Every structure is written in C-alpha cells, then in structure tokens.
C-alpha cells in the first residue's frame, strides 16, 4: 500500500464512522413508512452537507448523510484508457451482483464509479465498525485489483507483440 493511500483511507474511515450516527425516521409524507432520505431528498432540513474526501483529482469519495441514511460514493483513480476500461467493467461486474452486497447500489451517483447506501436498518442489523471496515477493505482491494489487472494486461500485450514481431 502506498504512503499516500493510508492517510486517505484513515480520513475516509473517520468521516464515515462519524456519518453513521443514524436513527429511525418515519416518512413525513407516507404514514408508517421509512425511506432513505438521502435518496428521496424531499426534506432539505433532514439532509446534511455532503462531504468530499479527496486523495487527488481522480480519486475521491462523496459522503452524503441524512438522519436515517448515508450514501457513500467512490471515484476510482483512472489515469489512462486501460484503467478506465478496467474500472468500468469491474464496477459493472460488481453492480450486476448488488443483491449479494446488502449496501451496494445498482447505479452509482453521477460522476462516481460505485455507490453504497447504508440505512439505519443496516446499522441496527450489522456492526457499524464492521461496515466501515468492509468499505475501507473494499477500497484497498479494488485499488490493488485494478493495478494487478493492468500489470497482467500490459504483460500479456507485450508477449503478444513480441510473438507477432518475431515472425518478421
């Protein structure tokens, strides 16, 4: 793990932990229903200011909080076209299996690669620090996986080019 990744992940961890102070909040419109206010957005007084934790211009997190839910969006570093393709395909693969991840959204927030939605029910059923650990570990693993796939792809391209050029 790089030296700049650790402080970034620590900042994300502390901010996300503070944002997960969620409680039950019934809908003001429909009786006996509770909807994630960060998704619905009908009551602006219930929404908190969105926070952006940034490592650099290409890599950042958006944390949108409300009384009963938190939407956590990640923009993954994409320096070149290969990384853009790898990230897009990898995120499509994960979002296609969103029902396996209880907190993963099928569609990310505009401008971000992947989003999570954590409601007060998730924090009641699961431990808050385990949710935060999962997201931080997810960020570490995705960063490592994309780097590994890019190295493998470059090595494979080099091998194919050498094989092709050896014919001449």
Swiss-Prot record:
Source organism superkingdom: Eukaryota
Entry's Gene Ontology cellular component terms: actin cortical patch; Arp2/3 protein complex; cytosol; nucleus
Gene3D superfamilies reported for this sequence: 3.30.1460.20
GO BP terms in the entry: actin cortical patch assembly; actin filament branching; actin filament polymerization; Arp2/3 complex-mediated actin nucleation; endocytosis
Example of a GO MF term: actin filament binding
Stored Pfam families: ARPC4
Cytoplasm as UniProt keyword: yes
Cell compartment(s), UniProt: Cytoplasm, Cytoskeleton, Actin patch
Coarse class of the protein's main subcellular location: cytoplasm
Keywords: Actin-binding, Cytoplasm, Cytoskeleton
InterPro entries for this protein: ARPC2/4, ARPC4
Protein family (similarity comment): Belongs to the ARPC4 family.
Function: Functions as actin-binding component of the Arp2/3 complex which is involved in regulation of actin polymerization and together with an activating nucleation-promoting factor (NPF) mediates the formation of branched actin networks. Seems to contact the mother actin filament.
Subunit structure: Component of the Arp2/3 complex composed of arp2, act2, arc1/p41-ARC, arc2/p34-ARC, arc3/p21-ARC, arc4/p20-ARC and arc5/p16-ARC.
UniProt-recorded name of the protein: Actin-related protein 2/3 complex subunit 4
Primary gene name: arc4
């Amino acid at each position: 793990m790089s030296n700049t990744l650790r402080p970034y992940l620590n900042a994300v961890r502390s901010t996300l932990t503070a944002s997960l102070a969620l409680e039950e909040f019934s809908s003001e419109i429909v009786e006996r229903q509770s909807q994630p206010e960060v998704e619905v957005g009908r009551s602006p007084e219930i929404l908190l200011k969105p926070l952006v934790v940034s490592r650099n211009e290409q890599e950042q997190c958006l944390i949108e909080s409300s009384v009963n839910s938190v939407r956590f969006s990640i923009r993954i570093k994409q320096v070149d076209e290969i990384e853009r393709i790898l990230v897009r395909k990898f995120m499509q693969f994960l979002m296609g299996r969103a029902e396996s991840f209880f907190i993963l959204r099928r569609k990310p927030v505009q401008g971000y690669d992947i989003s999570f939605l954590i409601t007060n029910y998730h924090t009641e059923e699961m431990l808050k620090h385990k949710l935060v650990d999962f997201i931080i570990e997810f960020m570490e693993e995705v960063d490592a996986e994309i780097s590994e796939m890019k190295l493998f792809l470059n090595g494979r391209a080099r091998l194919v080019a050498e094989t092709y050029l050896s014919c001449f």
